[in-house]
A protein has these predicted regions:
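Short coil/linker segments at helix-helix boundaries
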Residues: 141-178
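Membrane-proximal, proline-rich intrinsically disordered regions
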Residues: 7-54
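Conserved, well-structured interaction surfaces
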Residues: 68-141, 171, 189-197
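Inward-facing hydrophobic residues that define packing positions of alpha-helical scaffold repeats
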Residues: 99-102, 177, 184-185, 228
Length: 231
């Protein structure tokens, strides 16, 4: 009997340095990005805004090859199916890893005790960050939004749960952008802190800025201009 009790005591111990995500303090850590993750290497994406060529090869070489994701981004070639390059791109897996962290937070939050306002704020931050990573994914690995073709154009999977066994189907562009706006709803933004907790976390300014960027991609220019005034 004494041996049994001793075993139970050892089983109840939490390993040093580990977290069970069983309280608000611990689960809040999921909102802080890991900058060693390849998902945060944005250099190659600067070409999309004509800022720089990042770590890419010589522009003449990339454009001459006429294939690959780097070529598609640099040449703004909409005829390239960017989705076929997802398996070999570290951004793709890295972004979905970050999305999974947000989904874990959202799935666990309701079961935790604590301040209701804080829980609402954490949920809002997770939804905004989830939308942010999906926004990057759809702009890198799918065609640009066109209202005339969005219902038929392939987009990306939009993952809103942490079921790792489920195969997430690729949605249409229209469905992806609908979910982006759903995650960036006015209710969600209102629950964000007026000022971000730290530079890794979203506040109201980021919420409005992201929603404005989504409307900009959708060519809803009046709404985009209105939202940018809140940033």
């Amino acid at each position: 009997m004494m041996l049994l009790c001793a075993c139970e005591n050892y089983l109840d111990l939490t390993p040093k340095g580990a977290t069970l995500l069983d309280n608000l303090t611990e689960i809040e850590y999921l909102l802080n990005g890991n900058y060693t993750n390849s998902a945060y290497e944005f250099e190659d994406l600067y070409v999309m805004t004509n800022d720089s060529y990042g770590k890419m090869a010589n522009p003449s070489t990339v454009l001459a090859n006429n294939i690959g994701l780097e070529y598609a981004l640099m040449a703004y070639d909409e005829s390239v199916d960017r989705y076929v390059y997802t398996n070999s791109n570290p951004h793709y897996s890295g972004y979905y890893s970050n999305i999974n962290s947000m989904n874990i937070l959202l799935a666990r939050l309701d079961d935790l005790s604590g301040d209701i306002a804080l829980k609402a704020s954490l949920a809002a931050e997770a939804k905004i960050l989830r939308a942010y990573w999906h926004y990057l994914l759809v702009n890198i690995f799918a065609a640009q939004y066109d209202a005339a073709t969005a219902d038929a154009q392939g987009g990306i999977p939009y993952v809103t749960d942490m079921d790792l066994e489920k195969v997430n189907e690729k949605l249409t562009l229209a469905e992806v952008y609908r979910l982006l706006l759903e995650d960036c709803s006015e209710k969600t933004i209102n629950n964000l802190p007026d000022k971000a907790v730290n530079i890794l976390r979203p506040g109201k300014a980021m919420g409005y800025a992201l929603r404005a960027k989504i409307h900009l991609q959708m060519k809803n220019y009046i709404l985009q201009q209105f939202l940018f005034e809140f940033c």
